[in-house]
A protein has these predicted regions:
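N-terminal metal-binding scaffold of metallo-dependent hydrolase/deaminase domains
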Residues: 1-36, 46-47
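A cross-family signal for N-terminal binding/gating loops and helix N-caps
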Residues: 40
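Hydrophobic alpha-helical hairpins/lids featuring a short glycine-rich hinge
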Residues: 88-130, 136
Length: 209
């Protein structure tokens, strides 16, 4: 059991002074207001509720540091960044996604984020493309291992662009038809079964018909 004393804490009904939070197994078990600190308390100035990361692509954590560069021709742009992102996306399998997402989620938790909306479009494991929902399970494992609260938002990605009705080769691991996507969404709702939330994402006007 751990106790934290906050000089000020933001509770559901607003700010309170001299608040003690008692934690059991990593969760807040008891909240007391108007109490003096004692020697066993960890003392903090302010405590606020955990934040929510409202838009995450966890696999891109592995891209950090690989795109902070300039070409000699100075022609870098979002589109050159996207090519490197696609290269990474095509190489991430389920085992790698679990490890990358676990690291990203642990970093979120240590920074004060206690929930995450994961906008996910790596729907197929490149090493085992016929194994259904391996990448979904990888994210669930990462969230469970880290302890973050997950909202899974599968993203529909149908085509390469307005004038190209088919996905490009480097998009095939995550491109889906609408009926495939709706089936994935239904399976995700059943798989999470109350342990998290499931949303629906459409990538963009460019990528969705």
């Amino acid at each position: 059991m751990t106790s934290i004393h906050a000089a000020k804490a933001f509770l559901p009904d607003g700010w309170h002074d001299d608040v003690r939070l008692t934690l059991e197994n990593g969760r807040i078990d008891k909240v007391e207001t108007g109490v003096a600190a004692d020697q066993i308390d960890q003392q903090l100035a302010f405590v606020i509720p955990g934040l929510s990361n409202a838009h995450s692509h966890a696999f891109q954590r592995a891209l950090a540091g690989h795109t902070e560069q300039r070409s000699p021709a100075n022609r870098d742009s979002f589109w050159t960044w996207r090519e490197q992102m696609y290269e990474l996306a095509g190489a991430v399998d389920a085992a790698a996604l679990t490890a990358i997402a676990r690291q990203a989620y642990c970093e979120m938790l240590t920074s004060g984020y206690t929930s995450v909306a994961e906008f996910h479009y790596l729907h197929r494991d490149p090493l085992q493309p016929d194994v259904e929902d391996a990448m979904l399970q990888a994210l669930l494992d990462a969230a469970n291992d880290s302890g973050i609260r997950l909202t899974y938002v599968p993203v529909l990605y149908e085509r390469a662009g307005f004038d190209d009705p088919h996905p490009a080769d480097h998009q095939r691991n995550f491109a889906m038809k609408a009926d495939e996507f709706l089936a994935l969404h239904a399976r995700a709702v059943q798989t999470l079964d109350g342990s998290g939330s499931v949303g629906i994402g459409a990538h963009s006007l460019r990528a969705v018909s």
